[in-house]
From Swiss-Prot:
The lineage of its organism: Eukaryota, Fungi, Dikarya, Ascomycota, Pezizomycotina. Belongs to the methyltransferase superfamily. It catalyses: 4-(3-methylbut-2-enyl)-L-tryptophan + S-adenosyl-L-methionine = 4-(3-methylbut-2-enyl)-L-abrine + S-adenosyl-L-homocysteine + H(+). Its EC number is 2.1.1.261. This is 4-dimethylallyltryptophan N-methyltransferase easF. Keywords: Alkaloid metabolism, Methyltransferase, S-adenosyl-L-methionine, Transferase. Homodimer. It is an enzyme of class 2 (transferase). The gene is easF. Pathway: Alkaloid biosynthesis; ergot alkaloid biosynthesis. It comes from the Eukaryota.
Length: 344
């Protein structure tokens, strides 16, 4: 079976800016690490293992919704649509939707977007494209912003109906204010144009605010190596700068995974889960390559948040984003739901 096409739509190489993002985050208060640092190829392997654990309810619930409601969700997507998947790390979940579209004989174009070229190649290789006649597939190598620019500006694409998939609770990784801005940006790029009345966003949100359930989900097997792998990746990126001649001399970089441990917390005030790295033994000097930054004992270096949305917060998110809620798909007892959104 021939390899599916991949289009490189990158406006710049993210790897080139990550070292600057690392330094900026570590010199801020509170200290942070950029989320993209955690999604190297090795990091994604650890995350995929973690997300399959029994206690990690978000993935399981989302799969159940797509498996049971796939036909209804597929009916909401217009014929001739361009489907832009902004979270295509693996196709196990969205596969149910694609199979439903094929069964309904809807001619659509599915584009899997990923910032990692190897991960994108793996994703596309897993697609049994020979089983599909109506759904056609391709990959897009780039960031969210690259994907939105592409769907808005590509002549043969921009006037077709668009369906943007934002599954995997991706919107929960943003602060509430930034989530509204990001969702509005998607709407402005993908829900405008000649077919705006036929275009939509399919968004998943989690409403669970039970601290024990949430923290148990984010401490299940696989999450610790996922978190610590980012330190190895960060050091590799920083050392590459030296090899490329950006620095004139070899500098020290103290990012040893064994000196850190993973911390999982529920923030009651903000309604979010927080994931951080914290020194294991005492103060850690990160070395001259990182401006001799010192992380104090018990000081948190936050790298991820997962916001949960109750009904009031969800309503405000959609209002601030300039979108209207259409259909909603969930199952009894589920905290996760998938929302159809249209331009207001």
């Amino acid at each position: 079976m021939p390899a599916l096409p991949v289009i490189d739509i990158r406006s710049n190489h993210v790897e080139d800016s990550l070292p600057e993002q690392i330094i900026k985050g570590l010199t801020s208060q509170p200290k942070t690490l950029p989320p993209l640092l955690f999604y190297s190829n090795e990091g994604l392997e650890h995350w995929n293992h973690h997300s399959r654990q029994p206690d990690f309810y978000p993935r399981r619930q989302e799969i159940e919704i797509l498996k049971q409601g796939g036909n209804d969700i597929a009916r909401s997507i217009a014929p001739s649509s361009v489907i832009l998947d902004l979270g295509s790390a693996n196709l196990e979940k969205v596969g149910y939707l694609l199979e439903a579209l094929e069964a309904q004989e809807k001619d659509v174009l599915y584009f899997a977007l990923d910032i990692s070229a190897p991960q994108l190649a793996t994703t596309l290789k897993e697609i049994p494209s020979s089983n599909f006649r109506h759904v056609r597939f391709a990959g897009l190598h780039g960031t969210f912003e690259d994907g939105l620019r592409w769907i808005n500006e590509t002549p043969e694409i921009r006037d077709l109906p668009h369906c943007v998939l934002l599954l995997g609770l991706t919107i929960g990784n943003f602060s509430r204010q930034n989530a509204a801005a990001f969702l509005q940006n998607i709407a402005n790029h993908a829900l405008t144009g000649a077919s705006k009345n036929k275009s939509s966003i399919l968004l998943s949100l989690d409403s669970c605010k039970v601290p024990t359930k949430v923290t148990r989900a984010y401490t299940s097997d696989g999450v610790v190596p996922f978190a610590l792998q980012a330190l190895t990746y960060a050091k590799a990126l920083l050392c590459d700068r030296i090899d490329n001649g950006i620095d004139e001399k070899v500098l020290s970089c103290n990012l040893r995974p064994e000196h850190w441990h993973y911390l999982s917390e529920w923030n009651f005030a903000l309604g979010r889960h927080e994931a951080s790295l914290i020194p294991r033994f005492g103060d850690v000097c990160l070395g001259s390559m990182l401006q001799d930054i010192v992380v104090k004992k018990d000081e948190k270096v936050r790298f991820a948040c997962s916001y949960k949305y109750d009904a009031k917060e969800r309503q405000k998110l959609f209002l601030d984003s300039g979108v209207d809620q259409g259909m909603v798909w969930t199952n009894e007892g589920c905290d996760v739901a998938i929302y159809e959104l249209k331009l207001a």
